[in-house]
Amino acid sequence: GRVAEVAFARGLPTPAEMAGALGAVPGHLGMLVETGAIVARLLARGVRISTRTIVTRACGSDALTSVELTRVDAHWRPAGSPRVCAADTLVLGYGFSPSTELARQAGCELDWDSPRGGWVVRHDERMATTAEGIFVAGEPTGVAGADQSRAEGTLAGLAVAQELRPASALGDALARATRQVEAASRFSTVVQRVFEPDRAGLARLAEPETTVCRCELVTRGRLTDALQANPFLSTANAAKLECRSGMGPCQGRYCEGTVAAIVAAERDQPIRESGRFAAQ
């Protein structure tokens, strides 16, 4: 099939954002060149690339037939009339969510960090979590890419080895691993900041008939009705118990963030105050 359009919800990077990203370029030039080549190839084949544009509706009865796209402002609020693009396939992506279920069940404390994906496992400079004897690396610390995951894995492994054998001469190796994590983090932090989704903006786009939880077929309207009927319902987990959102096979992997954002909007509170689903 033919790609009709690639739409980005955010605008082009500002001069200040570009200047702030310069420190992340060393060591990652190849990745930037590859990205530029992909964009050039799309443009050469006539693919439209739009910025400040978001999908506001997918249309069709038994199958997708068209997509409605709308210009948005800096906070992802529709700022123009929608246009329709014929399509039989739609791919959406608004960031990644770290898998932290095992860490939660093990008693590790989490922190809310929206650019890194939402709820991430708290750890120290050696990748040790708040739960004794448990170290963490990769995705649970925040979605940061393969390079940082490998570097964190090396650092965590060395830290575990040193803890098991304190007399081991691992000082130099630990220092190198720490520098590798720091270098990878400089790049990932820029990418995370530039492409952080506007979670409140996404929640606003959901209409009453929009399916929020696909596993249990819970709509935005059903969730809103429950929140309005119960003024003391103020967390994502409470909404889960009330509406069954997040009780399906995926256990909230797809809907937890949306439910938390909707609860936050209805209760006029930060998304972090909505909490998270209990890990099962």
Kindly give the residue locations of the regions a language model identified.
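Residues forming the flavin
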Residues: 1-243, 249, 253-262, 266-278
